[in-house]
Amino acid sequence: MTQVAIAYDDFGLVAPDDAPGIESAVATLEAVESVALPKAELRTSWLYQMTQTINTMPSLYLEAGAIHGCVLCKEGEPVCYTEDVGRHNAVDKIAGWMFRHGVDPADKILYTTGRLTTEMVIKTVRMGIPILV
């Protein structure tokens, strides 16, 4: 019996001899490189403010733990807060909220409690948000 090493990455299933996930990742990264994000301001005080907001906002995390939160901010002030057990889903909820409400991403900051994956960074770029924390 032949053993094949199979791994998962942020873009799906990757097999060593046939790596469509890698090709897809390269194509996606190349597409994102050409995106021009607006210049944005970030102040240290806003980072402290966002951290305070996300850590004290009434949430499932405070009740149960093991929940990822994302807050969309403008100049450190929360505009939208979402939670999900999946950190990618929390980002997707922000994207959906922005779409439904016609929110201009140019002056926004996305702050997330989850560790950042390549896919989350790419999603943020595609959303047009210039700052990801």
Predicted features and spans:
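General structural feature for long, well-ordered alpha-helical segments within catalytic domains
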Residues: 43-46, 50-53, 66, 87-90, ...
